């Protein structure tokens, strides 16, 4: 056990030992101890007050007092008063700190604080944070607050039953709060709203609404029972800052950074996932709200990805295949702590076409230029299954659900009907394409972009559901 010595105090101990000794029995929590009250009263004002001699007719030299201190901490303080030495380790330091604060023994107070700060541990958090607030120990409070903020995902369940409004506010408003995104704070509150009481005000005081997803904003409106959310222009928290993004940065610059990324969208939010950055495949992702013109943080994926595909389903965002792990799949959505690995694909696939019908995810193509296999994953299932094969291979095609049918279009075109579990051929596009996109505009299915024989296709085609064919779109 480490020993700490107060050399200045040690010089005075010899003189104190020559003084008249008065014995006092101290009843503490967990036991009692007989002390030389003369020495102990010299230690601090607390002991001078609580060990005051109560003379009787018999002038009894032994008195008895009761102190609200645990016997182990009191024993350490008594030993220090006799020797100038205090014994501190990780097991006794927190209780000893509280006892030394109550007894006003400054050397032990600052020695305990320095010991705690040098090797701060999770088990110190609650007591140290409460002592920091209660006794105004700013360095202990600041260090503990930052520790809790940085380890928030590990400590969130431990602190909720111990901290009051002020304690939670200091933590949740911190730049150091380690959360994957701002939606996580809202989700954390909703899960505990029955316990939090007046912490409803925290939502207004600590949430950085400019980094919330639309779902997070709607949750705030629901919590506050309002139709318009408060304005916020705070900087992002350190945990979800992107080291390669300067602040502020416009949306076009952010999009340029995510070169060769996978993209998909949910409503007005476009998700940019993986790609090529600094001459390597990376695992970063970001969301861009093109209506409010702000970016929304996404935690890094478990795997770097290039030539992957993304699809929203089951209130989650799924990322499928791509290099360097072409069978891997993972999912995430705003408010989740991290991406979750999902069952692997049955075949390795890069740039596969993906779509979702009734929360069933379908994956087509991306394996080889001759492959016609398809796979699907049912909600809450732990294994992909092969579906009906397509008529044509769709190595670089795209997919979209339109009118309850799953359209698969590239150099060739066909659609899948879930009710009959069959594919149906339709006319090929007028201009065959690799890596095009299907979009819906004014209830019309449009085919845009793509390449063919190294040339970009700038003609837009519209699907005619009466003739099962494609026409050049005139914008009407």
UniProtKB/Swiss-Prot annotation:
PROSITE patterns: BTB (PS50097). Disulfide bonds: none annotated. Induction: Expressed in the early phase of the viral replicative cycle. Belongs to the orthopoxvirus OPG047 family. The gene is OPG047. It comes from the Viruses. It comes from Vaccinia virus (strain Ankara). PANTHER family: KELCH PROTEIN, RING FINGER DOMAIN AND KELCH REPEAT-CONTAINING PROTEIN DDB_G0271372. Keywords: Kelch repeat, Repeat. Gene3D superfamilies: Kelch-type beta propeller, Potassium Channel Kv1.1, Chain A. Residues 10-90 form the BTB domain. Might have a role in the suppression of host immune response. It holds the Pfam family BACK. Kelch repeats lie at residues 269-315, 316-359, 361-404, 406-443, 444-476. Coiled coil: none annotated. Residues 125-218 form the BACK domain. This is Immune evasion protein OPG047.
């Amino acid at each position: 056990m480490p020993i700490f010595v107060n050399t200045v105090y040690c010089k005075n101990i010899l003189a104190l030992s020559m003084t008249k000794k008065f014995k006092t029995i101290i009843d503490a929590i967990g036991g009692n101890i007989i002390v030389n009250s003369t020495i102990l009263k010299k230690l601090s004002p607390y002991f001078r007050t609580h060990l005051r001699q109560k003379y009787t007719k018999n002038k009894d030299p032994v008195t008895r007092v009761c102190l609200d201190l645990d016997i182990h901490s009191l024993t350490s303080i008594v030993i220090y008063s006799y020797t100038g030495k205090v014994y501190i380790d990780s097991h006794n330091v927190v209780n000893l700190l509280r006892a030394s604060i109550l007894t006003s023994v400054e050397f032990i107070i600052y020695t305990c604080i320095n010991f705690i700060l040098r090797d701060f541990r999770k088990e110190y958090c609650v007591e140290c944070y409460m002592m920091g607030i209660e006794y105004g120990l700013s360095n202990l409070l600041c260090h503990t607050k930052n520790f809790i903020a940085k380890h928030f995902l590990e400590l969130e369940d431990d602190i909720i039953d111990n901290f009051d409004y002020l304690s939670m506010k200091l933590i949740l408003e911190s730049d150091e709060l380690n959360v994957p995104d701002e939606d996580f704070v809202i989700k954390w509150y909703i899960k505990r709203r029955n316990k939090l009481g007046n912490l409803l005000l925290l939502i207004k005081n600590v949430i950085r609404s400019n980094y919330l997803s639309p779902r997070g904003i709607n949750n705030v409106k629901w919590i506050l029972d309002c139709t318009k959310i408060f304005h916020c222009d705070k900087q992002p928290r350190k945990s979800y800052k992107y080291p390669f993004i300067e602040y502020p940065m416009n949306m076009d610059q952010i999009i340029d950074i995510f070169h060769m990324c996978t993209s998909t969208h949910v409503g007005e939010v476009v998700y940019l996932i993986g790609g090529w950055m600094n001459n390597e495949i990376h695992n970063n992702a970001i969301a861009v709200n093109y209506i409010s013109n702000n970016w929304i943080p996404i935690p890094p994926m478990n795997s770097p990805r290039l030539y992957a595909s993304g699809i929203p389903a089951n209130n989650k965002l799924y990322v499928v295949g791509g290099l360097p792990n072409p069978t891997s799949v993972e999912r995430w959505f705003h408010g989740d702590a991290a991406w979750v690995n999902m069952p692997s694909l049955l075949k390795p696939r890069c740039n596969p076409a993906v779509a979702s019908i009734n929360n069933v995810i379908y994956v087509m193509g991306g394996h080889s230029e001759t492959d016609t296999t398809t796979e699907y994953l049912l909600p809450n299932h732990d294994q992909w299954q092969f579906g009906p094969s397509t008529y044509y291979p769709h190595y670089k095609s795209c997919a979209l659900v339109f009118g309850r049918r799953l359209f698969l279009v590239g150099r060739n075109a066909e659609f899948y009907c879930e009710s009959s579990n069959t594919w149906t051929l339709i006319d090929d596009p007028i201009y065959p394409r690799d890596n095009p996109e299907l979009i819906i505009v004014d209830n019309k299915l449009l085919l845009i972009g793509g390449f063919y024989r190294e040339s970009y296709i700038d003609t837009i085609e519209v699907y005619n559901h009466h003739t099962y064919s494609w026409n050049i779109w005139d914008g009407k």
